[in-house]
């Protein structure tokens, strides 16, 4: 399998990217290099090799959840630049 310039142009259009001719040419070469590497990996003999989802034997290295007292609402809000009732007030980010 190989990537053509037409493929790169199509993917760029889908991703709303614009490439110069030089960038598109370089991207084509780089994607073909990546695909060649993946094909090489596919040729490896992995018979008898167990699949891994994680290279570490550790299961859960996080601390246990322990309920403990927290600061009061007033303490949490005392340095807030803007608040409304018992809540932090922040700028609207979604229209």
Curated annotation (Swiss-Prot):
Q: EC number(s) on record?
A: 6.3.5.-
Q: Which domain of life is it from?
A: Bacteria
The alphabetized UniProt keywords are:
ATP-binding, Ligase, Nucleotide-binding, Protein biosynthesis
Q: Show the Gene3D superfamilies listed in the entry.
A: Glu-tRNAGln amidotransferase C subunit, N-terminal domain
Q: Annotated Gene Ontology MF terms?
A: asparaginyl-tRNA synthase (glutamine-hydrolyzing) activity; ATP binding; glutaminyl-tRNA synthase (glutamine-hydrolyzing) activity
Q: Which reaction does it catalyse?
A: L-glutamyl-tRNA(Gln) + L-glutamine + ATP + H2O = L-glutaminyl-tRNA(Gln) + L-glutamate + ADP + phosphate + H(+); L-aspartyl-tRNA(Asn) + L-glutamine + ATP + H2O = L-asparaginyl-tRNA(Asn) + L-glutamate + ADP + phosphate + 2 H(+)
Q: Which GO terms describe its biological process?
A: glutaminyl-tRNAGln biosynthesis via transamidation; regulation of translational fidelity; translation
Q: Short name of one Pfam family for this protein? A: GatC
Per its UniProt record, what PANTHER family does this chain match?
A: GLUTAMYL-TRNA(GLN) AMIDOTRANSFERASE SUBUNIT C, MITOCHONDRIAL
Q: What does this protein do?
A: Allows the formation of correctly charged Asn-tRNA(Asn) or Gln-tRNA(Gln) through the transamidation of misacylated Asp-tRNA(Asn) or Glu-tRNA(Gln) in organisms which lack either or both of asparaginyl-tRNA or glutaminyl-tRNA synthetases. The reaction takes place in the presence of glutamine and ATP through an activated phospho-Asp-tRNA(Asn) or phospho-Glu-tRNA(Gln).
The family classification in the record reads: Belongs to the GatC family.
**Subunit structure as annotated in this protein's UniProt entry:** Heterotrimer of A, B and C subunits.
List the HAMAP family.
GatC
Question: What protein does this entry describe?
Answer: Aspartyl/glutamyl-tRNA(Asn/Gln) amidotransferase subunit C
């Amino acid at each position: 399998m190989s990537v053509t310039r037409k493929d790169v142009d199509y993917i760029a259009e889908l991703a709303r990217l614009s490439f110069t001719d030089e960038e598109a040419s370089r991207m084509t070469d780089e994607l073909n290099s990546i695909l060649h590497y993946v094909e090489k990996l596919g040729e490896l003999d992995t018979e008898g090799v167990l699949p891994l989802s994680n290279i570490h034997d550790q299961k859960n290295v996080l601390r246990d959840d322990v309920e403990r007292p927290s600061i009061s609402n007033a303490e949490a809000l005392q340095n807030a630049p803007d608040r409304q009732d018992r809540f932090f007030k922040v700028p609207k980010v979604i229209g």
